[in-house]
Amino acid sequence: MIVIIYDGDSYGISKRIDYMLNSTTSSGKRTGILAIGAHPDDIELGCGASLSYYSNEKVYIISVVMTPGCCGAEYIDRHKESQEALNMLGCNKLIPLNFEDTRLYLQIKEMISSLEYIIENETPQDVEITRVYTMNNTDRHQDHIAVYQASMVACRYIPQILGYETPSTCLSFLPQVFESVDE
């Protein structure tokens, strides 16, 4: 299986991906991934195969879901379903946030603060986040665009930020990074 991921600056990135995630960091810490989604199921659908692969490689994974995802549909506990799915994919920690669904563009500053807090305070001391998976900048959903914008600011010191595609909202997604997740 191949997972397609967009990176705005992907020159020579394929070799760097495997190196960064199959070893400890230069500081001797365990490698970590931060996966960010606007709604429950965005992470699972957008980069779930990659997360599963890297969890098997003992990479520490934190997933952040910005909204409960309850607008426009009959209420179900989507955070609980997302927690179960992300646990099956091997995520070590899920942080469900409660920003207002379909209104994230009004909450970008608060999302940036939340993500910066999570990076600083929710990452174990022996883990260094070296990669972020987040929404991509060609998405048409207003919440996805807002999460992309907040992620780019909050994660500016993390060496690699990759955007993933979510079904039905990306009309012009042009992947530049491909990950092989075959075992």
Model-based region annotation:
Residues D41, T67, S82, L94, ...:
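Divalent metal-coordination and catalytic microenvironments
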Residues G32-P40, E44-Y75:
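ATP-dependent adenylation/pyrophosphate-handling site
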Residues I4-L34, L106-E183:
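Metal-dependent de-N-acetylase/amidase catalytic core
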Residues P68-A73, E100-L104, N136-H141:
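Short histidine/acidic/glycine/proline-rich micro-motifs that form metal-
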Residues L89-T102:
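A conserved beta-strand->alpha-helix junction
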Residues S63, I95-L97, G163:
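A structural preference for short, hydrophobic beta-strand core positions in alpha/beta folds
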Residues G72-L89:
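Glycine-rich phosphate-binding loop and adjoining beta1-alpha1-beta2 segment
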